[in-house]
């Protein structure tokens, strides 16, 4: 599968990098590190990026450096500038509805309650179709405030599990690009 753009949804990383809600930016940083690349800041358009060759294709790795609810504007501007279709992008984000340690690909994504995804639909239009990689962070126990939960760091135990999950996701992204989505899903979705 050809992915020209891989985006990790994020709040500003200098303020929120280690938080649960910035799991997408963790993923991009880990992926860039795998390819021995350092992200470059585009100050004018508020994002970090780097190009990497995965298999036969180059993919642009991006972390928007804005608040989650306006990530869509950054992504839209990037796709317009580089002539990338929405179905050629993979959006990586945290997911409250998946337990910590679980991740799922979703192809031809159509809706979500995640503010970063809502922002993409707002910028691209409701009929926009793209692919996602959802990384579970679980829900807070004892009906804790969701915003507080999202904007806090995971526990050390959760962080270890999240990092293991991201490592597995990166391997599966390689399979997705170099082979096919069914093979990648079989590996990622296996317990």
Swiss-Prot record:
Major subcellular site: cytoplasm
Keyword Cytoplasm: yes
UniProt xrefs under InterPro entries: Pept_tRNA_hydro, Pept_tRNA_hydro_sf
Gene3D superfamilies in UniProt: Peptidyl-tRNA hydrolase
Domain of life according to the entry: Bacteria
Keyword annotations of the record: Cytoplasm, Hydrolase, RNA-binding, tRNA-binding
GO molecular function term, any single one: tRNA binding
Recorded catalytic activity of this chain's protein: an N-acyl-L-alpha-aminoacyl-tRNA + H2O = an N-acyl-L-amino acid + a tRNA + H(+)
Signal sequence, renumbered to the chain: none
Enzyme Commission (EC) number: 3.1.1.29
Residues annotated as catalytic: 21
Protein name: Peptidyl-tRNA hydrolase
Organism, scientific name: Wigglesworthia glossinidia brevipalpis
Gene: pth
């Amino acid at each position: 599968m050809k992915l020209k753009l891989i985006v990790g949804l994020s709040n500003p990383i200098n303020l929120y990098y280690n938080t649960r809600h910035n799991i997408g930016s963790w993923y991009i940083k880990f992926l860039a590190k795998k390819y021995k690349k350092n992200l470059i800041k585009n100050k004018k358009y508020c994002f970090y990026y780097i190009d990497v060759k995965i298999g036969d294709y180059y993919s642009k790795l991006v972390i928007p450096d804005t608040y989650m609810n306006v990530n869509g504007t950054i992504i839209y501007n990037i796709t317009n500038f580089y002539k990338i279709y929405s179905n050629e992008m993979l959006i990586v984000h945290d997911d409250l509805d998946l337990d910590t340690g679980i991740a799922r690909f979703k192809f031809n994504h159509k809706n979500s309650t995640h503010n970063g995804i809502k922002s993409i639909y707002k910028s691209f239009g409701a009929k926009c179709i793209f692919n996602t990689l959802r990384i579970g962070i679980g829900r807070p126990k004892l009906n804790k405030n969701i915003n507080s939960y999202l904007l806090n760091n995971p526990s050390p135990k959760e962080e270890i599990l999240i990092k293991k999950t991201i490592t597995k996701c990166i391997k599966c992204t390689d399979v997705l690009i170099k082979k096919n989505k069914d093979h990648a899903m079989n590996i990622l979705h296996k317990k």
